[in-house]
Amino acid sequence: MDERLLSGESAYEDADLEYSLRPQTLRQYIGQDKAKHNLEVFIEAAKMREETLDHVLLYGPPGLGKTTLANIIANEMGVNVRTTSGPAIERPGDLAAVLTALQPGDVLFIDEIHRLHRSIEEVLYPAMEDFCLDIVIGKGPSARSVRLDLPPFTLVGATTRAGALSAPLRDRFGVLSRLEYYTVDQLSAIVERTAEVFEVEIDSLAALEIARRARGTPRIANRLLRRVRDFAQVRGNGTVTMEITQMALELLQVDKLGLDHIDHKLLLGIIEKFRGGPVGLETVSATIGEESHTIEDVYEPYLLQIGFLQRTPRGRIVTPLAYEHFGMEIPKV
């Protein structure tokens, strides 16, 4: 997959920045009002009862703040957070090592939880339900099962593919929160806050322009601001103005709706080769040279969100809105 400026996936250079920008409390957290308000109630109720918070599943497109919310949950509960990911847990023993190291009340955050192997999920079930761990000792006829008690803990799982979770695992989460794309106003506030951290002056109109092209995603908004800041320092006087912002984003090939060359390639491929569709996912994959799951999980969600693409039983269809965006005539049926 191409390295994309507009990818919601975390890149190496994002890690330190996101840590420094990360809000510590729900009050500081911008956006996701529905999920935030529900979590406020659930956390306060758990603290009043002096219990651990129910297990939480956070799902939605990448870059919307799932990792940030997991850390905030731990902060609000006044406990530590232990972070791992589905791909990092290769064997049941790996999960057992993580679980037995937890302290009472701790938050265990598993990113990409949909990538856990089914055999590891089965170890997780009793840990989530009964706070215990069943371990098989020995092999063959002499093998025996030993049950270890675990301290009460909260599992926070994050996924971009909630549908890929097995039903037994999904059903063990007491709190399910879908994170939605951010509004332009919310992203503009995030851009201005990030500019303060960077100690960079930014015009409010420039912040809005970056927000409009950030695909509803804070991670992308912050990444665009970093690149525009570079242009402001080299081609301007250091202030991020509307003029500098528009010039920078044009040179970076980010159009007014936040579409880049890969989005154009996908949409125009369907329009020019298949008369706008319907066309199957595998055919689209072969046409643009990207894996089907990458198209489905990374490229399509935003195009669906803005109404440029439709998924139908017969395949993908490019909508009239996309034709208008490209200044193309809609083909007659």
UniProtKB/Swiss-Prot annotation:
Binding-site residues for Mg(2+), renumbered to this chain: 67
Pfam families linked: AAA_lid_4, RuvB_C, RuvB_N
UniProt keyword terms in alphabetical order: ATP-binding, Cytoplasm, DNA damage, DNA recombination, DNA repair, DNA-binding, Hydrolase, Nucleotide-binding
Region (Small ATPAse domain (RuvB-S)): 183-253
Any one cellular-component term (Gene Ontology): cytoplasm
UniProt-listed Enzyme Commission number(s): 3.6.4.-
Compartments (UniProt record): Cytoplasm
PANTHER family xref list: HOLLIDAY JUNCTION BRANCH MIGRATION COMPLEX SUBUNIT RUVB (PTHR42848:SF1), PTHR42848
Swiss-Prot/TrEMBL domain comment: Has 3 domains, the large (RuvB-L) and small ATPase (RuvB-S) domains and the C-terminal head (RuvB-H) domain. The head domain binds DNA, while the ATPase domains jointly bind ATP, ADP or are empty depending on the state of the subunit in the translocation cycle. During a single DNA translocation step the structure of each domain remains the same, but their relative positions change.
Protein name: Holliday junction branch migration complex subunit RuvB
Organism from which the protein derives: Bacillus cereus (strain B4264)
